[in-house]
Design a protein with these regions (language model features):
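Extended, small-residue-rich solenoid/repeat segments and analogous flexible loops
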Residues: 1-35, 39
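Residue-level "contact hotspot" at macromolecular interaction interfaces
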Residues: 3-5, 23, 41, 75, ...
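Transmembrane beta-barrel architecture of outer membranes
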Residues: 31, 37, 41-43, 49, ...
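Short, functional N-terminal and low-complexity linear motifs
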Residues: 12-14, 25, 44-50, 88-89, ...
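Glycine-rich hexapeptide-repeat left-handed beta-helix
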Residues: 50-51, 56-62, 66-170
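The repeat-register position in solenoid repeat domains
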Residues: 25-26, 31, 44, 55, ...
């Protein structure tokens, strides 16, 4: 199709749907029934899995969204991983413009649709929801079944709303 670039070394299942514009990098894998709606960059070695839907996204190299994920209007950093069924919610339920909330500050985006921004090496647990405008710092873990909003600092473990701890050095 038009405006679709797929690296020769990438693997795309015959049942995957890809709409342009889209770039799929070297050694990336687009699995069975993946649904790429367009405006997507899938980095080198990234995995877009079974029944995962992408729209208006940048997936940096080695990102994994391997099982039943929705990632819309979002940026996922190097080697970030979203567990099965985790999603980026990109529209507020009251349909107002998305704001990013960080350390008591409110940053207006001017956007009706904005998902999440994940730093490098973020691990999102299964079944988690990243609410519109969520920003997660590098090297952070999100526990399964979490509903995350606002800013989560780099090097954290997000256990639940109001319970975020700093990772211990290894």
């Amino acid at each position: 199709s038009e405006n679709i670039w797929i690296a020769k070394s990438a693997s795309v299942a015959p049942t995957a749907y890809i709409n342009g514009p889209c770039i799929i990098g070297r050694n990336a894998e687009v699995r069975h029934c993946a649904f790429i709606r367009g405006n997507a960059i899938v980095g080198e070695g990234a995995v877009v899995g079974n029944s995962t839907e992408l729209k208006n996204v940048i997936l940096f190299n080695k990102v994994q969204v391997p099982h039943y994920n929705y990632v819309g209007d979002s940026i996922l950093g190097f080697k970030s991983h979203m567990g099965a069924g985790s999603i980026t919610s990109n529209v507020k339920s009251d349909k107002t413009l998305v704001e990013v909330k960080c350390n008591g500050n409110v940053i207006p985006t001017g956007l009706k649709k904005m998902g999440a921004v994940l730093g490098d090496n973020v691990e999102v647990g299964c079944g988690s929801i990243l609410n519109p405008g969520t920003v997660i710092g590098c090297d952070t873990n999100i526990y399964p079944l979490s509903s995350v909003r606002g800013y989560v600092a780099a090097g954290s473990i997000y256990k639940k709303q109001g319970e975020v701890v700093t990772k211990e050095p290894r």
